């Protein structure tokens, strides 16, 4: 009975501990600052690694409220919870400056922990102590405290090593198990997210359940097995840490070893390749973006973008050199600043422009002063740090804008073929993310790898496009001498609409999916720009439209590798690896049950398939086949051939198909009526020239001319029907970066191109009317810009302001209904004169009240229907009603 009693008691204690910790955890979300703003959103989640890589270089034990939520069920005593929760404000004060908002929030949280949570838990758990994490980096005694921690860690490492040596008599099974476990940890350490010497490579997560004992070493990385386990061998990465290694294995440190280790590093992100002054600028911008005002809005929100040139033309008359925070950030990312001082000058210019344009708004001026003070403090702090603190891997790397290999120039963002150590006939497809040079004169690049189908692990029934590649999460370093040549990878969504409008240097590959090597799964890429280097994300991708393009899909090139006894319940196999500097030698295939739903046409065994995909067993279609790209261009346009519109209807795609089939039928009918035209107008071969024969030939020639005239007339008429106009404009619009086409009603088409013929009168009239409303001074800066509005019956150019619809069904006709009727609707209306009541004939003492001017909005909405404005007569009438009665009357 005693064991059962002990077990029940332990369970009750665990349940009570969970309830107590959960209660204190939930109370954290009730904390507010003096102004009433909740502070929990600041500490709820860890900052993104992508945006704040330096955070994880400074903070060795990142903890958030979300971290506590996941760890509470695993705490065995209250001290573990206390160690973690105290770490949150300590981290915030370590990373942020003293005059920042987050530092103040951390003080509020720290005070609550000392005054409320700690006393509450102390009553129930008397052994609880408030952890002392030591001084902050800017406080005296910080270096001494860190040195003591390092010495303590070394003692623990030596003790673990001695304990491991004394346990050499353990059985072979246990030794093998521990060895496998250690190798797993070493592999994990060598993968992205664990090397503390690389800011970009450490990936923090709230999912880790760490050893509570690690809380005793707040400035040491969790998972310290890489240096203290007796079975650990040094990972392939060249760790240039100043802390000596305690491994018993000799570590080669020669140049050859450094080169091999660098190329074998599996990065999860491209490395930081910036000079110290650029990293200083990036740090300042990142901290500014997370600063929050007392009102809850971001400190930089008002400075992010410039005013709209059309809506606030006076701003560009007033400000000679407009610049926004977005412009500054773009110049920082593209390394256009050559010194930190240039960055400061632009920031001060932005503040000056803002104060000039908001000189009548004291609240905005106050915000600009706060921003200036914060910026000055951050800049001073960044400039005070030595340059060596910005060298992430212990070696200075000079960023390059260009490298030249075999007379071919390569830049960041270029697609390239890299030497494949496993198969020289299949170069690695990659995109260049970084270019740099080391002090020894060698030039390096970092590229994101794209796998070919035969290099992945996938289902045996999976289908692939011709020349398809999959994006991976591997960002590998290469010497520039590994460059073989150029290539180009196009996103599938863009390739559906047309061909890239550029000269291709090398083979063309198609990419639709991202491949996860750990889980062996394929995920469709929804946002292609997120996969590109930030230096080229804002560049336009010109496309030559191709309507009616469909894609052949082909079986897996390694389907023959499926074992004969394979079943749908087998484990997912592993690929066959070769050189660590290259993709797998060959992937693997496995079986799974048939997919009930296959929206993307990924598998040959599924029942459904998109119309733009042709699988191996599908019936062939008529069209122009391109064997090299694995595509076919049919006479039927696909739904993806048109650019995206603001108005979407389920009937539009079917209407396009109906229209195409109708046009084909008409063409066939016309073809059947055609008359043979050979030798018309001349006598038959070898026949005599008679009057009757001559008349017959003249009649045939007349019929031919009439037929040609009718055909020409039909052809001209077809150019003006609505579907043809839409198709033509679609082709023209897709050649430029003109944004989305917004279509609301058939009576107001919007064409994303400028009209250049027979519009002189319209342009002069339109400019004249706008000048009357806005004044010539406001019109001058933008009267000739692209997107000028022309109002007339029929298609028009880009609409920048929308007129309120009157609700007339003739003006609200849906676009699909307009296409179906294919007829112009006539507006039925009758002209009526404006009637006015006689104001002078009324009794002046009817009600003794002045007219209600505010109700005017209900009867005269603005902007007025179809651009109409009140007449001068009606305006005079309203003014007379508002005029006070004269004393003479």
Swiss-Prot record:
SMART domains assigned: BAH, BROMO
Consequence of gene loss (knockout): Heterochromatin spreading downstream of the silent mating-type locus HMR.
Pfam family, any one: Bromodomain
Compositionally biased tracts (Polar residues): 241-250
The keyword Phosphoprotein belongs to this UniProt entry's keyword annotation: yes
Biased composition (Basic and acidic residues): 210-222
Cellular location(s): Nucleus
Renumbered residue ranges of the record's region Disordered: 151-268, 601-624, 831-865
Domain of life per record: Eukaryota
Domain Bromo: 12-120, 280-382
Keyword Transferase assigned: no
Compositional bias per record (Low complexity), positions renumbered to this chain: 158-174
Assigned GO CC terms: RSC-type complex
MF (Gene Ontology): chromatin binding
Predominant location: nucleus
Keywords of the record: Bromodomain, Chromatin regulator, Nucleus, Phosphoprotein, Repeat, Sporulation, Transcription, Transcription regulation
GO annotation (BP), single: nucleosome disassembly
Bias kind Basic residues: ranges: 255-268
BAH domain mapped to chain residues: 408-526
Modified residues (Phosphoserine): 682
Compositional bias per record (Acidic residues), positions renumbered to this chain: 197-209
Family in the record: Belongs to the RSC1 family.
Subunit note: Component of the two forms of the RSC complex composed of at least either RSC1 or RSC2, and ARP7, ARP9, LDB7, NPL6, RSC3, RSC30, RSC4, RSC58, RSC6, RSC8, RSC9, SFH1, STH1, HTL1 and probably RTT102. The complexes interact with histone and histone variant components of centromeric chromatin.
General remark: Present with 2330 molecules/cell in log phase SD medium.
Cited function: Component of the chromatin structure remodeling complex (RSC), which is involved in transcription regulation and nucleosome positioning. RSC is responsible for the transfer of a histone octamer from a nucleosome core particle to naked DNA. The reaction requires ATP and involves an activated RSC-nucleosome intermediate. Remodeling reaction also involves DNA translocation, DNA twist and conformational change.
Name of the protein: Chromatin structure-remodeling complex subunit RSC2
Species this protein is from: Saccharomyces cerevisiae (strain ATCC 204508 / S288c)
